[in-house]
Curated annotation (Swiss-Prot):
SMART domains: Flavin_Reduct. Its EC number is 1.5.1.42. It catalyses: FMNH2 + NAD(+) = FMN + NADH + 2 H(+). Gene3D superfamilies: Electron Transport, Fmn-binding Protein, Chain A (2.30.110.10). This is FMN reductase (NADH) RutF 1. Catalyzes the reduction of FMN to FMNH2 which is used to reduce pyrimidine by RutA via the Rut pathway. SUPFAM superfamilies: FMN-binding split barrel (SSF50475). One of its GO terms (molecular function) is FMN reductase [NAD(P)H] activity. Belongs to the non-flavoprotein flavin reductase family. RutF subfamily. Pfam families: Flavin_Reduct. It is an enzyme of class 1 (oxidoreductase). One of its GO terms (biological process) is nitrogen utilization. It comes from Rhizobium rhizogenes (strain K84 / ATCC BAA-868). Keywords: Flavoprotein, FMN, NAD, Oxidoreductase.
Length: 206
């Protein structure tokens, strides 16, 4: 068996000797060499990750700021990996990188608030998505509290105040199941989505 590397593909080539009895009148033995080639793609993990990120950049997603406060401290981060799970009971799913500086505060506090951003919140999203100190992040906007004590952005389109009821392993991330305790909405305004590595307003359909 030979192993050949060709442009990122691994090729296994097997040469098999097959004995076959000739069915003709002479009754001769024949040995036939058969080469079987099979192409087995072996993905480069770095290439796959890069392609996945590029593909996910084409999936538009709402931009949110997720906050927490409690015994483990005040923290907040920008997130697009947020979605609805069910309305019975009302539950959101939030994905949080375990290497993120906010991870200990969020998981130890056990509460969070998902604040859905509007088109005017691009700068605020950048603050919460970078390495800006916590105090400076929160000083850039007005906040209040709903039921859990997590900061609720005053001019968010919607604020979902939640308790973390379950946590699952998702590779590099924790998958947080968050049961909603309180909701605050405001009328008007356009949403903010992240698409193709840039911010875009998301208005109501005409």
């Amino acid at each position: 068996m030979r192993l050949l590397e060709m442009r990122g593909l691994t090729w296994y080539v097997a040469c098999i000797q097959i004995s076959a009895r000739h069915a003709g009148t002479m009754g001769m033995n024949m040995k036939t060499s058969v080469a079987i080639e099979k192409a087995i793609p072996v993905a480069d993990p770095d290439v796959v990750r890069a392609e996945f990120r590029n593909a996910m950049a084409r999936m538009a997603a709402a931009v949110n700021i997720v906050t927490t406060n409690g015994p483990a401290g005040l923290a907040g981060f920008a997130a697009t990996a947020v979605c609805s799970v069910t309305d019975s009971p009302p539950t959101l799913l939030v994905c949080l990188n375990r290497s993120a500086s906010v991870h200990p505060a969020v998981t130890e506090n056990g509460v969070l608030c998902v604040n859905v951003l509007s088109e005017g919140h691009q700068d605020l999203s950048r603050l919460f998505g970078g390495k800006t100190p916590v105090a400076e992040r929160f000083a850039a906007a007005a906040w209040s509290e709903l039921s859990t004590g997590s900061p609720a952005l005053e001019d968010a389109l919607v604020s979902f105040d939640c308790r973390i009821v379950r946590r699952a392993d998702g590779g590099t991330h924790d998958i947080l199941m968050c049961e909603v305790d309180a909701i605050r909405q405001r009328d008007g305004g356009q949403g903010l989505v992240y698409f193709d590595r840039n911010y875009h307003p998301a208005g109501q359909a005409e």
